Swiss-Prot record:
<keyword id="KW-0800">Toxin</keyword>
<comment type="function">
    <text>One of 3 components required for cytotoxicity (tested in African green monkey Vero cells); the complex is not hemolytic.</text>
</comment>
<keyword id="KW-0260">Enterotoxin</keyword>
<dbReference type="GO" id="GO:0090729">
    <property type="term" value="F:toxin activity"/>
</dbReference>
<keyword id="KW-0843">Virulence</keyword>
<comment type="subunit">
    <text>One of 3 components (of 35, 45 and 105 kDa) of the enterotoxin.</text>
</comment>
<protein>
    <recommendedName>
        <fullName>Enterotoxin</fullName>
    </recommendedName>
</protein>
Amino acid sequence: AESTVKQAPVXAVAKAYNDYEEYSLGPEGLKDAMEXTGSNALVMD
């Protein structure tokens, strides 16, 4: 099976986290963040 998960270097992940900190954690905020980042999964600490 083919994987569609995009791999990103840690530096890019850290930058994305900083860039998208303003998103809320509600359903709409997560939806907006996933659309804006082009990711199909968000990992939050």
